[in-house]
Amino acid sequence: MLMKITEFDYRRISELVERARLDVDDVLGPVADIISMVRDGGDDALRELTGRFDGVTVENFRVSREEIEEAHKNLEPGVKEALREAASNIEEFHRMQMPSGWMSEVRPGVMAGQLVRPIDSVGCYIPGGRAVYPSTILMTVIPARIAGVERIVCCTPPAQDGSVPDAVLVAADMAGASEIYRVGGAQAVAAMAYGTETIRPVDKIVGPGNIFVTAAKKLVYGEVDIDFPAGPSEVLIIADETASPEYIALEILAQAEHDPQAASVLVTDSRDLALEVKEMVHENIKYMERANIIRESLERYGMIVLTADIDEAVDFSNAYAPEHLVIMTDSPEETLEGIRNAGSIFLGELSPVAAGDYGSGTNHVLPTSGCARMYSGLSTESFIKKPTVQRITKEGLRNLQGTVLKLAEYEGLHAHAESFRRRLRD
């Protein structure tokens, strides 16, 4: 049944928020083997694995400057202009995110503060294969460049002829990637984490991917940093009787076309709206190019939740912690005040998720599967470190001595106490 309607019940909330997750446990063994192969075999292992999984023989993994220039010549001008406009908006938004360092006198003679420093090198995984995602390059590379990352590596699976799509190369060049490699899957993650003869290791790996990429990121975490766990895409829409059922239906269809495991949820206090949306979804599926994917997605993970009021809808949304949250109520800003958990939020009927996916400037690399409860989406801050700094004068030592000496001795760390006490005596 497409878009089943269910009544909200606080006692069933854990059941209602369930949806598809990437269960990587089943593939951890094979992925660990792939990682070991790349660690031990370097480029030769990458070639073998690329031939096995992608059916492609690759001699040179690194994309040349000549290939990038050729891509600029070949790419359709309209697509190139759209990428340029998207890049401009993404850059403007992410520059506003950049934090500043600071220093403060916390006590007389005690200056303490925080610096802002970029990560040295970052790897951006760009999904490929049957689909082309140049927008994901913009979303991963531009924030890294703005943060000041010196070396930004992109890895993406090669096409059947060994090439990388023109749009991907142009987007990477526009965004400011330092290096682009034609390698994908878990083997690309392993190469970025541990290095090969061609690909030097990086300090952090970001970007979405399939279950094997996600498992590989999980396994290399600790050797490198990663962004956050990834899973199937999802949207939750909070709507009242003032909302357009057509806009809601189209938002649901747009999300469902991503993947058979994508989740699309409407939460409303209007039964009439729920029934209208359900009918419109049914009517419009047949006009969609990806109708089979949409139908499977909505049969498995499509849902309409009826609540007593919008406050209950907000409670459900916070428990669900959606990747994308659309608010179509009479006063979306007022509804927003109660929202705590969401990856990216779209206010009002004229703010579709597609705008955030491609053009508004916000990032579309977002936490899924409830991870918005503790993760934020990719941002400029994803690529920086914040070391703390302090400078203390003799006056500051005197002001701190009671606290420092008492606690150091209480914890039995007498050398700590002496290192402090000696400075007071000198």
Swiss-Prot record:
Record-stated family: Belongs to the histidinol dehydrogenase family.
Top EC group: oxidoreductase
EC number of the protein: 1.1.1.23
Residues annotated for NAD(+) binding in this entry: 125, 187, 210
Reactions catalysed according to its record: L-histidinol + 2 NAD(+) + H2O = L-histidine + 2 NADH + 3 H(+)
Biological process annotations from GO: L-histidine biosynthetic process
Record's keyword annotation contains Oxidoreductase: yes
Sites where the protein binds substrate: 233, 255, 258, 324, 357, 411, 416
Entry's cofactor comment: Binds 1 zinc ion per subunit.
Gene3D superfamilies linked to this entry: 1.20.5.1300, Nitrogenase molybdenum iron protein domain
Keyword Oxidoreductase: yes
Active site: 323-324
Gene Ontology CC terms: cytoplasm
HAMAP family referenced in this protein's UniProt entry, alphabetically: HisD
Gene: hisD
GO molecular function: histidinol dehydrogenase activity; NAD binding; zinc ion binding
Coiled coil: none
Known function: Catalyzes the sequential NAD-dependent oxidations of L-histidinol to L-histidinaldehyde and then to L-histidine.
Name recorded for this polypeptide: Histidinol dehydrogenase
Binding site for Zn(2+): 255, 258, 357, 416
Keywords: Amino-acid biosynthesis, Histidine biosynthesis, Metal-binding, NAD, Oxidoreductase, Zinc
Required cofactor names: Zn(2+)
Taxonomy of the source species: Archaea, Methanobacteriati, Methanobacteriota, Methanomada group, Methanobacteria
Pathway annotation from the record: Amino-acid biosynthesis; L-histidine biosynthesis; L-histidine from 5-phospho-alpha-D-ribose 1-diphosphate: step 9/9
